[in-house]
Amino acid sequence: MEQFGVRNPAIELDSIGLGAAASVRYNLLESHLYEEAIRRREADLTAHGALRALTGQHTGRSPKDKFVVRNAVTEDQIWWDNNKPMSPEHFALLHKDMLAHVHGKDLFVQDLIGGADHDYALPTRVVTEFAWHSLFIRNLLIRPERSALESFAPKLTIIDLPSFRADPERHGCRTETVIACDLVNGIVLIGGTSYAGEMKKSVFTVLNYLLPERGVMPMHCSANVGPEGDAAIFFGLSGTGKTTLSADPTRTLIGDDEHGWGENGIFNFEGGCYAKTIRLSAEAEPEIYETTRRFGTVLENVVLDEHGVPDLDDGSLTENTRSAYPLDFIPNASESGMTGHPETIIMLTADAFGVMPPIARLTPEQAMYHFLSGYTAKVAGTEKGVVEPEATFSTCFGAPFMPRHPTEYGNLLKELIARHGAGCWLVNTGWTGGAYGTGRRMPIKATRALLAAALKGDLDKAEFRIDPNFGFAVPVAVEGVDSAILDPRSTWADGQAYDAQAAKLVQMFVSNFAKFEDHVDGNVRDAAPGLRAAAE
């Protein structure tokens, strides 16, 4: 086996059973990965210098094909209602077969870090058969100093082989696609999918398992900080606006998707961003748009015209087109990936029913209720089979990535909010004037103006009304924002139709939360939307 590149000679791939590979290239830089990806016809060079790759049939995550090894340690730690179990025996067979599958192949290795706070960092080795996957994960995770690579010792190893096909009967999985996580031994196996986001979310899943035991709250959120050190976090599922809204030229970006909240404050799990690019424009999102035109960026499933120019309006391959780039491609990004404790917590939802206001103030109890509920819409393309938005509840705003029971994360969040006095807001980036199909998407300018008012403290002086359906406080007027959209009922042509839709959503909240009621105190239960009306 030929081996190239900077690495720790004590932990080369033959030491973990991958010695049958023809060659291994360790920690290649961007230019070399470009060369390999283009030479191997894995990807195309765009007119502006980015690398474009296509992922075939899998243009989003495959959550139904993700498994966690169930053993004596994880038996009582994992929320098995939400995580599919795989036996240690099936995992061992899968591992053995994937090791055999690399025979004669060229492999690429990146040694990276998950977690900007050194106290909680997870050294991660990612082994891929595609050069573009190696560039993708190099962009997304934190890159150690080159001098540190010779002594690098991973605590997590990810093996990603898209050409491998799992055998459901032999490997205890569902299809030929598999994402299998051995959380105790720090191994993740990915096969049968080229979608690069599986690697990133596997690191997130492992951190979400490890960190709560150390008193750290792992979060599916973006984060930024103002010039006065006023940090903010933005919870939300894919496509609800985490990346867009946290890329604010007046504030320093900490990260766009995954963070921890520990003793030292907020820290990014990653060193890059994975932004949705469908219908991205230079006018609305100039900083993110500019990343699509840079050397080093990976464009995933973006259509190119005959001149190699990306057409960001073309969703013919998928609505889930993406740009993966290092965090320092954003002009005002944090170099450290860390900041202090947040003063403001934003919970983003894309309300497909069009009945929620664009912003609402939450009490600490309401914040925990809405965190555990995780109401939003699955937005087209982020998961296989989702073609248009549909209402869903994804607890902790990231159920697919949360191995432990939601109340474990919810109680941690509640404790941290109480300790540090953060203000909490619910922001709807979804629909107004009607449900999806008849209404329109909330104007991003209005959302930005409302967020700015909340972050600056301007809303503290505003007049509020209590929403009759959801019980939270909604500002009556905000400077620079059309007051009509602050009252969602007034934006509907038919007020009675709004009332019926709102009542339907309230009942969905109540029904969904039933599974958590025995795990929370009475104050949190009483924070339910329309609780009295629902009980009557």
Curated annotation (Swiss-Prot):
Q: Name one GO biological process term.
A: gluconeogenesis
**Residues that, per the record, bind substrate:** R61, Y195, K201, R322
Q: Name one GO cellular component term.
A: cytosol
Please list the reactions this protein catalyses.
Answer: oxaloacetate + ATP = phosphoenolpyruvate + ADP + CO2
Q: Which PROSITE patterns match?
A: PEPCK_ATP
Which GO molecular function annotations are given, in alphabetical order?
ATP binding; metal ion binding; phosphoenolpyruvate carboxykinase (ATP) activity
Q: What class of enzyme is it?
A: lyase
Name where it's found: Cytoplasm
TM spans, by residue?
Answer: none
**Residues that bind Mn(2+):** K201, H220, D257
* Keywords assigned: ATP-binding, Cytoplasm, Decarboxylase, Gluconeogenesis, Lyase, Manganese, Metal-binding, Nucleotide-binding
Quick one: which residues bind ATP?
K201, H220, G236, L237, S238, G239, T240, G241, K242, T243, T244, E285, R322, T447
Involved pathway(s): Carbohydrate biosynthesis; gluconeogenesis
Per the entry, which co-factors are needed?
Mn(2+)
What does the note accompanying the cofactor annotation read?
Binds 1 Mn(2+) ion per subunit.
The protein's matches in Pfam families, at most eight in alphabetical order, are given as: PEPCK_ATP (PF01293)
**Record-listed E.C. numbers:** 4.1.1.49
Q: What is its main location?
A: cytoplasm
Q: Which NCBIfam families match?
A: pckA, PRK09344.1-2, PRK09344.1-3, PRK09344.1-4
- What family is reported? Belongs to the phosphoenolpyruvate carboxykinase (ATP) family.
Q: Which HAMAP family match?
A: PEPCK_ATP
The task this protein performs is described as: Involved in the gluconeogenesis. Catalyzes the conversion of oxaloacetate (OAA) to phosphoenolpyruvate (PEP) through direct phosphoryl transfer between the nucleoside triphosphate and OAA.
What is the protein named?
Answer: Phosphoenolpyruvate carboxykinase (ATP)
Q: What gene does this protein come from?
A: pckA
